[in-house]
């Protein structure tokens, strides 16, 4: 929670979640030339009959966000309520179990995977108690125990890896950023 008990909630993450799990929803989806979904408010709002001609204007963005939220709430009330519950970092914390699988939806994952990956929480962050370190289970987990720490560091933090070298798929799931996931 923030000042005055306010919370944050990114409706685009909820839209990604809807796309990944409820493709039959009443939202209309925009795709690029490669048939990958586009999750940008200035594209999603007009595709769903929501006025958004003044994209990136604060008030226009707020109204478009409310319009998308209303469509999701009206068409998928249980999913909407679940997503809304994830605004509470304590609720998120209760749902995260170390080494248990969870489907995590986030803009950090490629659209070609519906921004969703099967992950597991490896640990809670050593410095911040409001986040967990998650690992993408599509990647070979033996890398975590077989590689030396210098090699792990390289696979995590090198900006541009050599061609053919896959980045280690470890991300932070931050509890107070309304993460979208299903345990």
Regions found by a protein language model. Give the residues of each.
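Conserved non-catalytic scaffold segment of RNase H-like nuclease domains
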Residues: 1, 38, 42-51, 147-183
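Acidic catalytic cores of enzymes that act on phosphate-bearing nucleotides/polynucleotides
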Residues: 85-170
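Metal-dependent phosphoesterase core characteristic of DEDDh/y 3'-5' exonuclease domains
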Residues: 1-77, 86
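Sequence-level motif detector for i,i+2 pairs with an aromatic at +2
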Residues: 6, 129-132, 176
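Extended aliphatic helical segments
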Residues: 14, 30-31, 62, 92, ...
């Amino acid at each position: 929670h923030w000042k005055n008990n306010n919370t944050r909630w990114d409706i685009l993450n909820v839209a990604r979640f809807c796309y990944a799990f409820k493709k039959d929803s009443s939202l209309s989806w925009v795709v690029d030339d490669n048939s990958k979904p586009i999750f940008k408010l200035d594209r999603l709002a007009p595709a769903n009959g929501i006025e958004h001609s003044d994209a990136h204007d604060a008030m226009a963005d707020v109204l478009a966000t409310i319009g998308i939220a209303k469509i999701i709430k009206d068409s998928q009330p249980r999913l909407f309520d679940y997503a809304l519950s994830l605004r509470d970092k304590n609720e998120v914390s209760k749902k995260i179990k170390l080494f248990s699988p969870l489907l995590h939806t986030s803009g950090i994952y490629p659209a070609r995977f519906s921004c969703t990956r099967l992950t597991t929480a490896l640990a809670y962050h050593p410095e911040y108690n409001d986040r967990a370190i998650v690992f993408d289970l599509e990647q070979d987990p033996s890398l975590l125990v077989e590689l030396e720490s210098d090699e792990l560091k390289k696979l995590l933090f090198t900006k541009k890896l050599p061609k053919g070298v896959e980045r280690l798929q470890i991300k932070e799931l931050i509890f107070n950023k309304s993460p979208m996931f299903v345990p």
